[in-house]
Structure formats: C-alpha cells, structure tokens
Amino acid sequence: MAKVISIANQKGGVGKTTTAVNLSACLAHLGQRVLLVDIDPQGNATSGVGIEKGDIDECIYDVLVEDVDTQDVIRTTNMENLDVLPSTIQLSGAEIELVSTISREVRLKRALDQVGRKYDFIFIDCPPSLGLLTINALTASDSVLIPVQCEYYALEGLSQLLNTVRLVQKHLNTDLAIEGVLLTMLDARTNLGIQVIDEVKKYFREKVFDTIIPRNVRLGEAPSHGEPIIRYDAKSRGAEVYLDLAKEVVANG
C-alpha cells in the first residue's frame, strides 16, 4: 500500500502547494509511483501539474460527496509515474454538504483505500484551514508534512495545527505521525532566516528536514507554465532541493 502524506499548515503562502507538486514530481522522476490529491478548492496543485481546470468533468468533490469511484476521477499527467486526483472550485461547497453525512471524517480515507495498491506515495495538498477537508486528509494519512516559511511569526498558528493533529490521533487515526517540518522560502542573505531555522529546530528537533527550500525565481515561475520545477528547469536550484527532499522522504521509509 502507498504511504499517504498530508501537506498541511493552515497559514497560507508557506509553500504547501509548491511542495506538494514538486515533491510529488521529483519522487516520480526517481521512479516512485505517485498520486497527488488536491483537496484545496483553489485547485493550484491541479493546474501546477498541467491539468486545465476547464477540462475537468469530475473532481475530488464527486468522490467525497457523490461517491464516484476514485479511479474514474484520477487523471494522468505529462510526467511518467505521476497521477493527480484533481480539484475545482466546486469543492468549496463540500464541507457544508458533508456535515450531515455519516462517517464524514473518513470519506477521503475510504476513497484512497480503493487505489492505494497502485502507488508508492500519495500526497494530499490541504487547504489553508483546519476544517473538515483537512480533517479528512489527516484521517487518511500515515503522516503529515508541515511547511514553515522562514519569516517572522513562522511558528504562529502551529500550535493550533499540532492540536488538531493530536485530536485526530486520539479520535480518528491513532497511527498519524509527523513526517517532518520543512523550512521554505529561505533568504540566506538575512539574519531573520537563520534565526527562524534555529527557532524551528529548537522546537521540533530531529523532525526538521535537512533540506531547506530557498527562495528561487525559477521555482516561482514554474506554476504559471503548468509544470513542476523538475520539468520546467531541471538544472535550477529549486529542482535540486526538491530532489534532495524526495530522497529524504524515501529514506524515511
């Protein structure tokens, strides 16, 4: 069965989708079979792997709310070994519609169980909130990867996320683990970035990935071309660091 990893942080702009897309693509590049699950109604992970939102007939909404078979909604991408379970703005109504549904917190888990044997890794790109969609992701996951931006107030709000993780561990998924904390958007020219690294490592200790994602122009350009960085510019610093991260994730087992 696939290892299922949620990429979560309720703060926006910390590199969740960038990490979901590029970590998935780099693992696929290394020969791993990967499914990227987009449960953010903005659908940026979907477009980030080249899927046009206007071309999507069915999406993760139909799986969660309408009980459509997961396999029928999965799309191949232009990268070998990388598939996507796409999202559209239709998903924004799912949390309200699921409130009265029986076993509402395990809808995604049941959906992914249908296809788990086809993949080595499944990554879930979570929305910037701690609502029912993120709860579904954590319930379906073996672990959670937490991106933290190397900026002032980096740790703000993390206690809320960690409390949600503990509640899910207690009531819904006792095996949920912290995969690791990923430092993102580092500007090595500033003292602040170094201070944040020290602060995060002091708090999370060995749970912090060795790989740190720097600010990188090519990494920022890639989504507008609908390509992961490993396809857009394989020689860029952004591609190098996400390949390093992919190797760390494989080594974690």
Swiss-Prot record:
It holds the Pfam family AAA_31. It comes from Halalkalibacterium halodurans (strain ATCC BAA-125 / DSM 18197 / FERM 7344 / JCM 9153 / C-125) (Bacillus halodurans). Mg(2+) binds at residue 17. ATP binds at residues 11-18, 214, 216. Dimerizes in the presence of ATP but not ADP; ATP-binding is required for double-stranded (ds)DNA-binding. Interacts with DnaA. GO terms for biological process: sporulation resulting in formation of a cellular spore. This is Sporulation initiation inhibitor protein Soj. Keywords: ATP-binding, DNA-binding, Hydrolase, Magnesium, Metal-binding, Nucleotide-binding, Sporulation. It is an enzyme of class 3 (hydrolase). Belongs to the ParA family. GO terms for molecular function: ATP binding; ATP hydrolysis activity.
